[in-house]
Amino acid sequence: MSGDPTASLKDYQLLELDTAAGNDQAPQLPTKTVLGFTPPLPTLPQPTELVYTKRRRPKRRSRCRCLCFTMGMFAMGVLMTTTLLVSTFVLTVPMVALRTAPCPAQTFGLGDECVRPVSLDAYNSSNSSEIGAVCGAYSEMPAPDNTTVLIMNLLDCLNIGINESAGEKLNLTDTPLANCNFSQNSVCSRKRVGVCYAARPLSPLGELIYKARQALRLDHILPFLQ
């Protein structure tokens, strides 16, 4: 027992030592490499135009929305400014400034009014209402006496140095009436004359504004614009 180094070991330990010694002395067997199938690695797609478009599409959409919003706000601003300017013009322009249409036939313009000389020979009464009846037939008003004298004198001055009478130029039905002033002339002294007047007609723009005010019922609110 003293000469054997393994005498103190147990049986299972001796078995392990024998097995390990046998493995060391056994020849190494050749190993065989088994080839297996490995799938190829996926290749990255090339950056084509389609891929570039997909990447840029969100940015283009955001730019398009921003542009549409800007254009919409600009159009709204232009529309609101135009509406404000037109409304201000319609509400503030005086109607006198829009009476620029030519006077009707057989009348002539004096400022903002159209004047019509008329003959009163067909009326026998001396009542002042007869001139009102004559002017009322034309939807006009009779002028005061002093205005009538001034207008008839003006017509007489227009005939000085002119071969064609003022009555023919003014398309008056009673041509001798235009040549008469209140003088001692025998022809003129037998004539009874009068003058009717009315506001000058509205221009097409004035008629449009007047109708707009009537539609909005602003005539009684803005009487100073008449």
Swiss-Prot record:
Chief place where the protein resides: virion
Membrane disposition: Single-pass type II membrane protein
Pfam families named in the record: UL45
Localization (cell): Virion membrane
Topological domains, Virion surface: 87-219
Residues of this chain annotated as glycosylated in UniProt: N124, N127, N146, N163, N171, N181
Signal peptide (UniProt feature, chain positions): none
Keyword annotations of the record: Glycoprotein, Membrane, Signal-anchor, Transmembrane, Transmembrane helix, Viral envelope protein, Virion
Domain of life: Viruses
Gene Ontology cellular component terms for the protein in this record: membrane; viral envelope; virion membrane
Residue spans crossing the bilayer: 64-86
Intravirion topological intervals: 1-63
Recorded family membership: Belongs to the herpesviridae HHV-1 UL45 family.
Name of this chain's protein: Envelope protein UL45 homolog
Organism: Equine herpesvirus 4 (strain 1942)
